[in-house]
Amino acid sequence: MADRKLFALVSTLIGISIILTYTLSAYTTILFGVNEFHFAIRQTLFGFISIFTIWILAQGDPDKLLAPIGFTLFIGSAVLMIAMPFLPEYLVSAVGGAKRWIKLFGFSLAPVEFFKVGFVYFLAWSFSRKLGHHGGMGIKQEYIRFAPYGVVFIGAMFVIAFVQNDLGQVVVLGLTLLFLLMFAGSSFRFFLTLLLGALMFFLFFIFTAEHRIIRIKSWWALAQNSVLELFPASIAEQLRVPTEVEPYQIGHSLNAIHNGGLFGTGIANGTFKLGFLSEVHTDFVLAGLAEEFGFIGVLFVVFIFMWMIQRIFKIANRSDDSTIYLFSLGVGLLLSFAFLVNAYGISGITPIKGISVPFLSYGGSSILAASFAIGMVLMASKKAKMN
């Protein structure tokens, strides 16, 4: 039997997302001249489809369906991402010249969201054949053994970071890959060398795009005072950026969080959603949550989210199948890193990456892809010893 608690927790988060979409999209509906329930109705539709998808997948036989679904997501979405730059304008939506969404029946679908789930399954399936067999292996042999995955990852990251101009997804997938490598049995020394290599690639991606440099400067302008206090004055002045670099989004996000206080301003009573924070019902949903529902509301959502992750990790820990073990771990890591990257970004701890919050942010692609991941984990949970 599939894990009912996990199903209930995910359904709860989806229900919360519908409420947040309604209350936080007030200004956006006016801006676009649509009905006040426009985004809430769409998110409700996405929510019901997602819950139904989870339920259907949970009924499946993991021995027969898990691999076909995983590889279909991996290969199918990869092909779509590669083909998107060559598709006509009426089939794709572009932002800043980057084509990220495919238009289907009045909705936009982002293949990268489904690629992440398929990529995690591909890694789990591949790593499971090498699980725990690195003992006594030198670091050179480890690099040779895992080189094919590095090639696949670099190819995927090139498409996502350069073609689709989406570095945030690279960060989430890169972190997931690194930690899955460690759980798959690679040595700690190998893990550290890959981590350093990933950091070098990350810096390369940042400094090859002007808009990313501006975003880093915007974040650093806000964070620099508290950090530079730790350095000697001569070094601190060299690292300081001009104060005219305005961290607009981060500043308003922090103001929204501060304005919410302990108990919040109350549902629909938020101020910063009224044009001060763009996309507050998507990328800044946690800031909107903090303003209207306060610290208590955020704490409740974090509790539900952490409980969901705990159930996913429990399924992984109770499984004797190494593929299911690694896939469940990978899904838990993927969702956790997405949540953390968003939370750190809107609170000014790290630069904003444009990553949505799983099951909470408005958007069909994100919630549906995450639902595929949860549905596959629930399907796999029938092979785990949960009792």
What is the predicted role of each segment?
Residues 4-5, 19-22, 26-164, 343, ...:
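Membrane-helix boundary/helix-loop-helix interface segments in multi-pass membrane proteins
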Residues 13, 47-51, 80-84, 114-125, 157, 173-177, 302-306, ...:
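Alpha-helical transmembrane segments of multi-pass membrane proteins
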Residues 45-53, 291-312:
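Hydrophobic alpha-helical transmembrane segments
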Residues 70-76, 147-160, 167-207, 219:
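Hydrophobic alpha-helical segments of polytopic membrane proteins
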Residues 101, 194-295:
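Hydrophobic, glycine- and aromatic-enriched re-entrant/interface helices and adjoining loop segments
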Residues 171, 175-190, 268-293, 355-368:
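Interfacial segments of multi-pass membrane proteins
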Residues 312-354, 360:
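Loop-to-helix entry and N-terminal half of a specific, functionally important transmembrane alpha helix
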